[in-house]
């Protein structure tokens, strides 16, 4: 017999982050994403989506460091092909096989960065990773 959760379907699709929190030092990224007030109880959590959340996911030092580390992982695991790096990146982020059109769009994005913005291939891959970490499929659960 398989283990069955007693949680409702809405509760089963939640992601949680468990970290040690010092009440006076709340991580800025978590505060942007409705982190609970550490000075009072929180019986009900409200979900919000506001522009500052998206901006923090694009501009925060932490997320940019994660994108850089992700790009290095892709270069290590698929050193011979940018197409394979993109496919692996999308597969890891979305947890499904990427569609050919998604891979083409990502490659076009990276080529445009190199041609128009004079980004080197590593910078283009890092920016692709930043974009991938901001996909709705990664940030939100359906």
Ranges and model annotations:
Residues 128:
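Globin-like tetrapyrrole-binding proteins
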Residues 8-11, 119-124:
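Extracellular/periplasmic catalytic domains that process cell-envelope and extracellular macromolecules
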Residues 80-82, 115-122:
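Short, charged, surface-exposed loops that flank catalytic or proteolytic processing sites
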